[in-house]
Swiss-Prot record:
It is a multi-pass membrane protein. GO terms for cellular component: plasma membrane. The chain crosses the membrane at residues 3-23, 35-55, 63-83. Keywords: Cell membrane, Membrane, Transmembrane, Transmembrane helix. This is Uncharacterized protein MG131 homolog. It is found in: Cell membrane. Its main location: membrane. It comes from the Bacteria. It comes from Mycoplasma pneumoniae (strain ATCC 29342 / M129 / Subtype 1) (Mycoplasmoides pneumoniae). The lineage of its organism: Bacteria, Bacillati, Mycoplasmatota, Mycoplasmoidales, Mycoplasmoidaceae.
């Protein structure tokens, strides 16, 4: 039961891997946007699961040691994804 707290960590790592795929060369812009959207969704899923586990499960050192960094890194990664591909997003969505 105590290792269920690793689930958000692995989901977050999956979001980071997807974000890394968005930097591959010679990809069409549409493909980059699809990868980024999937990375946003996976990152948000890790954030939601971590918040739910912190809210509804009892606390121990492993849980706090894994879930709090996942929460912080997930929020930071959300903004990093926006900033890293800002020129592409600005060109696609205008303004």
């Amino acid at each position: 039961m105590q290792y269920t707290v690793l689930i958000p960590l692995f989901i977050f790592i999956g979001a980071m891997v997807l974000f890394g795929f968005s930097f591959q060369k010679k990809q069409p812009q549409r493909r980059i946007v699809q990868i980024l959207f999937l990375a946003y969704c996976v990152d948000f899923l890790a954030l939601i699961i971590a918040v739910m586990m912190l809210t509804f499960l009892s606390y121990d050192d492993l849980m706090l040691g894994v879930l709090i960094p996942v929460l912080i890194l997930s929020i930071i990664m959300f903004f990093v994804m926006i900033i890293a591909h800002y020129p592409l997003m600005k060109r696609l969505f205008g303004h």
